[in-house]
Amino acid sequence: HAPATYRGWCRGRELADLGLLALDIDEADGGIGAGPVGTMLVSQATGAGLLLEPFLSSAVIATRVVSLLVRGTQREKLLGALASGEAIAVLAHEETEGWAQPLATTATSEADGWRLRGCKVGVLHAPMARWLLVTARTPDGIGVFVVDRQAEGVQLHAWRSVDGQHAADIEFDLSLADDARLGDGDERLLRRGPRWP
């Protein structure tokens, strides 16, 4: 049966079998590479059907973040798991002060990696996710960090939205390995605004 991490991802395998979880992944990375029009059409259909699964959160937004920032074996691992439905990843960016204010979540350098501290709010599908893609302010700009949802130092306050979707406010205070940061120059992600991608 499905691990607790993915409980509720009841249609994940079906969506993967249809290729929908690989829709927004480039063909060079083993995906379909349908582009924005194909993704929009599927999103329209899932919206009309009131699908509660994290198609937009994981198969579109998270895969776009990984595709933009990650190279090498880590890219292959993350995209492969997302495309197969083996794992869910969600972007944790919004904070209590909203998008217009500077990020309050910080990642400071440690001897063997990073110390991540802060709080994110309204993270859709976070209770179902395996990985949280967390934006944080670093000494050299904005970074995006991959964090295991069940790691010690990650505290979720789960709730349900009015349409029944799982969400959470999340507190972070934990150490991360050096390779938890996904790429460099990550501020380009934030220029896409709150309705990105």
Show the residue positions of the predicted features:
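Buried hydrophobic positions in well-ordered alpha/beta secondary-structure cores of metabolic enzymes
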Residues: 26, 42, 71, 116-118, ...
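Internal helix-loop-helix
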Residues: 17-76, 80, 84, 125-128
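Glycine-rich beta->alpha junctions and the first turn(s) of the following alpha-helix
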Residues: 48, 154-197
